[in-house]
Every structure is written in C-alpha cells, then in structure tokens.
C-alpha cells in the first residue's frame, strides 16, 4: 500500500509543477495543524503556561509559520521553555517549506530556460521557413537569405540532430544576423511526429530538406539520399502538411533517387493538386551533383562563369525578377507594353535589363511554366505573358515600365571587335579522388561533353593515382546524337517554324504561337514571331471558314499530344493538295489572315531547313566521334605532383588550355571546421598552376577550374583572385555549398528562378563571354546592348580587368546591370557577358514546350 501511495505521489510530481506546489501547501497546513494541536493539548494538561482557545492557538501557529520574526515577539513572561520549543519548531518548519518552494520554483524556471535554449518547446512562429539537417549548405544558404530578406521580417527554423545551442553558436560565429531575422533551432528528425508538432508545421511558409553530410552517421551518398527521401515522404504524409501544403524543396545527391521518392508520394501530391488547383506549387527536388557538374562543365565554355553566377543569382546589387501578370501591381503595366519585343524594351529602359518573357497559364489543366529567355528580337510580349528582367528592386521595375511610353531616345550604332571563347579546347583533369566507383567521373566527363557550346572540345586527359579497366573501353561516352529530323520523326521540319501551344477559353481548342522562323524558310516574309497559327486548311475548305470567330477557327483536339496531331494534319493536307491555307492571327494588327502556301515552295523550304539541321547534327556527331580517340586516362602520383610543385610544373601541361582540379572524396568530408585543411592540396595546386608563363605580349587563352570543399577556402581563393594577377583568362573556384545555397535561395522566392538556372545551364541557352580585341572602347551600355541584340544575344554585364605588364589579369569589377546611359570605358581584354541561344534544333530537342513544324 505504501509503495502504491509513494508511486502515485511520484507520478503526480513528474507531471507538472502545480502538483508539487499543492502538495507543499497541503503539507504546510497539515504540519501547522498538527503542531498547533500538540500545543493546545499541552496547554490543557498544564505543560504550557498559556491557555487559549484552539482557534487562537491555530492562528498563532500560522502566524509563526508565515512570519519567521513572529517568534521574537512572544512575551517571555507568558511562555515557558516548552512554549518556545514547540513554537520555534513551527517557524523552522515554515522556513523549510518556503525554502523548498523557492528552490522548486527556481529549479523550474532554470529548467524552463534550459528547455527553451535547448529547443524542447514548441515554437509559435508563423509563415516561417523550416530547414531540415545541418549540412555544410546551411550557413551559405542562411547568408544568402539574410541578404534577400533585408527589407522584411522573416523567421528561420533549423531542425537537426545537433544540440540547438551548438547550432546557434555555429551560425552566430559566421553570420551577423540582422535584427529583422529570427533564427531558432530544434533537435530531431523530420520524420518524427513529435518534432512535427513542435515546429508549427501547419503554419510554415516553406520546407527545405538539405542533404545531410557524409560522415559517421551517414556513410554514403545513398544513406544521405535515403534520409532526405524518408523525410520528404514523411512530411508529405503528415497531418500538418495536409492542413498546410506549403512549398517543399528537397536536395538529393542523385536526381533519379529524388524522382523515385516524388513518384512514391504521387498519390498525395496529385490529390493536393486537385484540392489546391493548378496554381499550387508541387514539391520539387534538386540534384546537387548534377548542379555542380553542370556549372563546372559550363566553366569550360565560359571562363569566370562562376563569378557571373554568384553575381547574377546572389542578392547583392541587381538580381532576377519575374514580372507576373497575376500580380495586381504589374498587370496594367504589362498590358501597356504588349507588342514590344526584348529589343524594344531594352532600348527604352535605362535601369533594368529584360532577358526574356514567360507564360504561366494553368487554365483547364496543369501546364509547364514556359520561359522564353533571349527570345528572338521580333518576338513580342503577348497577352498573359510576364517579363523576366534584371533589376535592383521591384520599385525600379515599376517605375521603369510605367514611364516607358514617355521614353524616346536614339541609340547609336557601334562596330567594336570582340572575340568569343571558341578556340579549340584541350582539357587536363586532375582527379585526386579515392573513390572505387567511377560513376562521379563518367558523369562529369559526359557533362563537359554535353555542355560544350562551340563543338570545339578536341581532347580530354584524366590524371589519377589509379584506374581500373572499366574506363578504357569508353562505353560510358555519349552516343553521337540523333536529333530525329528525318521524315516521320518528331523534329522533321516542314515549314521551318518553332512554336508553342496557346490555350484558349475552351479546353479542347488551342492555337500555335510562332516563336521563331528559320532563316531558310520563305515564310519569314509572310509570318512573324508572335503570330498565332489558329489552324490549317485546304483552299476549298478555307472558303467556308472565313466568317467564323477566332475561337471557332482554333484547332480542336483533346489535350495531350496536340502538336503531334496538328503536324500530322498539316502533312496530310500537303500530300493531298497543291496549296494549303494557314489561318493566322497577326500579332501586330490582331487581324485573322488566310495565308496561301504552295506545295512546291514548302518542298524547297523543307529541303533547305533539313539540310541546315543535318549540318548541325553532323558537326556535333563529328566532335563526339573524334573524342573517342582523344580521351585518355593516365595513372600519375598526384600527391607527388602536389608535393613537388614548382614554377615549372604547369609548363608540362601548357599544350592543354583548361585545367580542372577536383576531389570527389573530399566533397564527402563534410565536417564543420574553422580551417578545412582537406582543401590544402587544392590551394597548393591553385597557387602552383598560377605560375603559367605567357608568351611575350600574348593575352591569356588558358583557364583553370579548382573545386574546393569549404566556403572558407573559397573566400581565401576569391581574395587571392582579387589581389594577385593571374595568367588565366578565367580562374573559376567551384565550391558546392555556395552553388547549392544560391540555387536553393533562388527557389525559396520563386521556383521559376531554379527553372531559369536550369535553362541557362542546358543545351537551350548559354552564358557567353566576348573579349574586347580593340585597344580601347568607349560606349554606353545601351549602345553595347543594341550591338548584341542585333546578334540575338542579350547583354547582362561587364567584367572589367586590370592587367600587368605581362598581360596577367585580375578582376577589377563585375557589373551586372550597370548604369546604362553613362559611358563605359573598356580596355583590351575586358569581357562582356551575354545570354545566347543554342541553335533551333537544340532548342526544340531540349525544351518541353517548344516544337517544330
């Protein structure tokens, strides 16, 4: 019985503080009552001098209990030794009880403070961003977001397996957190239901699941990806996310594994799409390895690209904005500027750079966000389209576009001499990895080949301590591409038109807006970019259609595969008729025209366009076929290369003009260090290979790419680049954590930002650099902009270099969206940065929404 009573008391005390306080109050009352009763009894039997009623004795007992000084007020003549002894016991009992209560309350408050600091309590933040896993990406990502949210309040919640106090200490040691930013940490795993309750998931703005670092807990990249995957699946299945299906972005190492978990969660995602509508943003994934490989590969095309990436997608200075027609503050501005092309807008705007248009039409069914970057110079801003631009802030965009109708200026033509980075590229890759699986290496090599813009990759040498025989057969190399341009294949050209599908008010009707017209096609004289092909008909049938409305004339078909069925209809009409009629809504006049095309002219155009496509395919195939014989793998003790590095080491490889240093194994050493010593080898290579000697008076045509592990190491090398001259035309430092953090930060604001980055790093568009050949050039940015716009490229910035007497260089300044009306003084070797397109064939082959007719 006693054990049961004792256990019941212990259980009650464990539950909360109130039970303990109630117990002490009850104990106090019982104690005073017992001692007062003893005093009263002793008074009655004559052992005590005073004689009081019991109530008086009890009241005096409580007075002695609550007031420790009351015992000194007792009259000595009326109390004997036993009076003082018993009454003194009441006072001592009171002191013990109150001391205990004070101790309990103090311990409770201390425990509560410790609980708050250690992240055991539920957070009450709302509209917050939750980050899962404290990886090496986190601090660079928080740095980016602190810059991004400089003008508004935002809360970040960090969930990791580390102690919250330690997490906050690491963050505060590196980042100066602005007053408008609140960061709190909690310990746990995303898949824990108790954790999901504590982080106020049902009121979160966004969830970002970072890939944890390879280490003691997660031994391999597979372990890391599975942790992200099970976190993703658990969060999507939680009751909290069901209440609040906020944006979710998950980082995987392997893209295939990411899509595997997304597909596994498809039932929940599809149901949410039905509930939330087509405008709801479904969960998205990124592959950190793909992103790194792609950026590194693009640096072989455009040296110093990493600097451009940092400036364009960072949050200091100008950045990318999507001017959305769904946003009320932009809708009227966009309507006023419909019909203007990129060239028109950039000629009239002095403070922003328009780099393209986009359409996000989710009527009737879910559709891709269509991004038209560096669109043809005659492709106009159309109804329901938004603008993609580079600007300092939203106020600048509104002010610029509002006043565009008042702008009128004449931009002079200039004729400077620039050189592109289209020299033959010969690459030496120094692989310091210790991995037994070569998949990382084959993926990187294929990424370099796939990203090559000029078809100028002539050789690739890989140096490594040891190779197994699996690479020598070169079966991992991509097959020569087949662009499927032959008859009855998807990219077979008929009219030489690239188009995308336009929705109409009716679900089963659509139009086909012309994006561009091949220069070989005679239709370029009759049609323009922006015109909408409503339908196609025979000459006889067309006569019966002239009185019909635009909607009635629009092509009717069930959704899915519309472009294929329309193309089949066109082919059939051409086969059966000597002429066909294109029913077109002109973009300028908005009038519907019936345009006749002769069969023989179609045949001539088709042959010319097809021939140009064959030449594109042939050039690409030739490069890849030649590479099979010019990719070599050589075993070399790279530790000796580093240890014995001297001024002459680099000259052994001077016949190659692109050096890449990387270590996949070090990428997996992801411990948080003040001094990441695993990067010392790469820093030594960076310094050693910077001793490349240039021929007298010759400007650099070599480039170097160094992959390092820690963002602290990156800061050191960036500081070197700023203060020391380099013999390289471009000197890229690739650091995975900064790359991924910028990508994630961009996606935090608008997922279209990540789609834009993907486009710029695909075989659809590319970022190019043009080196000034002239000794000097003075021109406004507007004049330079016009010069490149006429070449169908969009100028976004300038890299200004400082040169020494030996033609070595260091970056003096990178200007993205500089002041456009002021004169810019450029010297020989300075580089202008543009966004350019791959050819038409690559665009339709890579794009999900552009098709060829």
PLM regions and their residue ranges:
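Cytosolic regulatory regions of ion transport systems
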Residues: 1-59, 63-546, 550, 557-559, ...
